[in-house]
Amino acid sequence: MTPDKDAPLREDIRLLGRLLGDTVRDQQGAASFDLIERIRQTSVRFRRDEDLAARRELEDTLDALSREQTIQVVRAFSYFSHLANIAEDQHHIRRSRAHLLAGSAPREGSLAHAVGHALDEQRLDPTDLAAFFDTALISPVLTAHPTEVQRKSILNCQTVIARLLDERDRMQLTPDEAEANLDALRRAVLTLWQTRMLRPAKLSVIDEVNNGLSYFETTFLRELPRLYAALEDRLAGAQPALANHELPAFLQVGSWIGGDRDGNPYVTADVLEEALAMQARVALDYYLDELHTLGSQLSLSQGLVGASDALLALADRSPDQSPHRSDEPYRRAIAGIYARLSATYRNLLGHPPARHAVAEAEPYADVAALADDLDTLHRSLVANGTAALARGRLRHLRRAVRVFGFHLAPIDLRQNSDVHERVVAELLEVARPGAAYLAQDEAGRCALLLDELATARPLASPHVRYSDDSEGELAIFRAARRAHLRYGRGAIHNCIISKTDDLSDLLELAVLLKEAGLLRPLEKALDVNIVPLFETIGDLENAAGVMDRLFSIPVYRELLAARDQTQEVMLGYSDSNKDGGFLTSGWALYKAEGELVEVFGRHGVRLRLFHGRGGSVGRGGGPSYQAILAQPDGAVQGQIRLTEQGEVIAAKYGNPEVGRRNLEVLVAATLETSLRRDGGDATPRTFLDTMQALSDAAFTCYRGLVYETPGFEQYFWESTVISEIAGLNIGSRPASRKKGTRIDDLRAIPWVFSWSQCRLMLPGWFGFGSAVKQWLAAHPKDGLGLLQRMYREWSFFATLLSNMDMVLSKTDLAIASRYAELVKDPVLRDSIFERIRSEWKDTVDALLAITEQVELLDANPLLKRSIRNRFPYLDPLNHVQVELLRRHREGNGEDARIRNGIHISINGIAAGLRNSG
């Protein structure tokens, strides 16, 4: 009999649910517990048995709740969503370990599979494979967004619960130990219940920085070095000559938090400098803690083990001259390193670390000097027969120092091209009266900008007071220059231009960088990457042409030499989706990448794509492994950056082991895609033409609803939680770029998040059904067969449909209809919702026909089971949220308890959906 692999997951969910129920009974009373349990059982009965009587009973019960009961129900089911996520993550870890323990073949997405595939199937020499990483860069980039609803305090509680579940899994506990573990779990669930889920005040940028840093403390600082070590060991196992080979720092975690100014007036030069200091503190604290522990471990006596001359000299320079450690050169050397790093801490941050050094010492001039001292320790251990000791904590510390430096994570700077344009126009008007920059056409603007880039003379005068906008932008770039001098050039690598639509947008940024000394024309030096961000459908279509013209400018090609002939380009998934819909956005991105590959190849420039993906499929989300493998040939080549946004950061990196697995997936997918034999399986012309036809039809359908239907904006604002999201203290950035209700002005993130909350997920599928219907009508004989072949043979199309499959499985039209009832105009409500319902049915029918499934997610039974297990806990939250929205709006939003309940429900639904923003 085949064992039920999901039984432990169900046991964990039952255990956590029981502990939460006990907590509710103890804290709120038996009546509250009985009510919540009745709602849960009714919801389970409806979902499990498709019992329509149970659905009516559920709706009647929820509609009859008092205000106080409503809040308790919302809290209980929201916390349960979080607990279910913890149990699910633990089950992923459990299954991965079981797979390894069974000696099974490596799974797709693992380092073992990727390396084995390269060596065995592609016949790559291990030395050549190691060389691949010499020029590679793989970087997930953390961003703060208006949908990140997790509080750090909640994350801390969840970490404790996850650790205790893991303990139950891995250890053979005695009865007393098992009882102690259960008591600890009970306390942790109680703490979670009594921890406020919402913030009392709106999040500041510094709060967001703190939130982001928690993932470095729990996951990245420890797991990245282990991943590097595992990869090096695997290469050494394949080629003994690589036994001592150390890979360069090709895998790094970046951040936008503290540097993303696009639409966020609260990101200033002062905030950037504070964010950099906070990051440095986390990195240095970690190094100091590791050195302290290393000093206690390396108690090696010179009478028993040798030491190199360099190590002895390092020990002699140490301020630790205690006679008790006179024969322990490794300990004394470590004490000296600690003292110098402690002085560095004080030098960079203005105060000493919590644990003082044995004595004063000179600070390190840069991180390379610290790395050199650690290398001296390493070489001495290896040369004197104690290489095993060099491969433990010291190995991980050396790797951490090389990856994280003194800056922890490079912070990207980002600003809208319109802002750069205004600043440059003002600077030119003062320096060159009559230049009339804004009145110039594109050619005139470029000529003026290239004139400025040909001279070292700055535009800005210290004797002129410019507008606040201009002063603020110049201050940011000057702060970036200071950061390079203080923390090293790794602190800020990239300056990103949002809404890039022409060549002048890139040259404007170049001129502003020159003002701060980050671009120095006479030296042909450029200290940061100038990164265009192409976001709308039109901009994506023009991207290759813009880059072609840029590379034709001699002065820019000279500057690229300072960046190793590598040019980064960012592609925006979110805005292109809001602009043209899911299908057209995906296709426009795919085509843009292929065109960029051709242009970059022709100019001999290395392309690095930065994918601005969100958590939801409507914003480019979905499994990273499949997404990377589905890239066009030549679009990766060892170079890839991608954003990690919203609640996805917590889901991917909140648990260290899950975080390690997600980092592995990025490396594995990048390796496999980069080493794929380019051009061997060119996409058939018929596939491309069909995709274009589908895209055109889907675009017309999507734009027809969202931008051309009278009253659609009213429908959206009244039938979703968009108004309430704007008031939720979950991000420092406003939900809209401008005041008003225009869809054009709304940020893509709350747009998608709002549709997810009401269980329509419209940005992740709308338009596909109509497009396929039109295609089949025009090709009645062979149309479906061709689409099925595209699904089987073209990874891009298969990934697109796989993501849509997942999105559609989370939709619920019955629940969505409850939200539609919030629309005051019945004619508007019925007409728009009926269009959505009809398109949803056409889309589901089309998807099932093409994928040859009977039900959604038949091809992914694990995900199907996971999502279905969530519905009984999500459904009550959605029903209660609708009722709270009705009461809130009827009462003009004056009841703080109702407002609080809405915000908790938003949190719980986001947790239950996992990738909604």
Swiss-Prot record:
A Pfam entry, by short name: PEPcase
Enzyme class: lyase
Known catalytic reactions: oxaloacetate + phosphate = phosphoenolpyruvate + hydrogencarbonate
Keyword Magnesium attributed: yes
Domain of life per record: Bacteria
Keyword tags: Carbon dioxide fixation, Lyase, Magnesium
GO terms, biological process: carbon fixation; oxaloacetate metabolic process; tricarboxylic acid cycle
Keyword hit for rRNA-binding: no
E.C. code: 4.1.1.31
Molecular function GO terms recorded: magnesium ion binding; phosphoenolpyruvate carboxylase activity
Record-annotated active site: 145, 578
Cofactor: Mg(2+)
Signal peptide: none
One of the record's GO cellular component terms: cytosol
Family: Belongs to the PEPCase type 1 family.
Protein purpose: Forms oxaloacetate, a four-carbon dicarboxylic acid source for the tricarboxylic acid cycle.
Protein name, as recorded: Phosphoenolpyruvate carboxylase
Organism, as annotated: Azoarcus sp. (strain BH72)
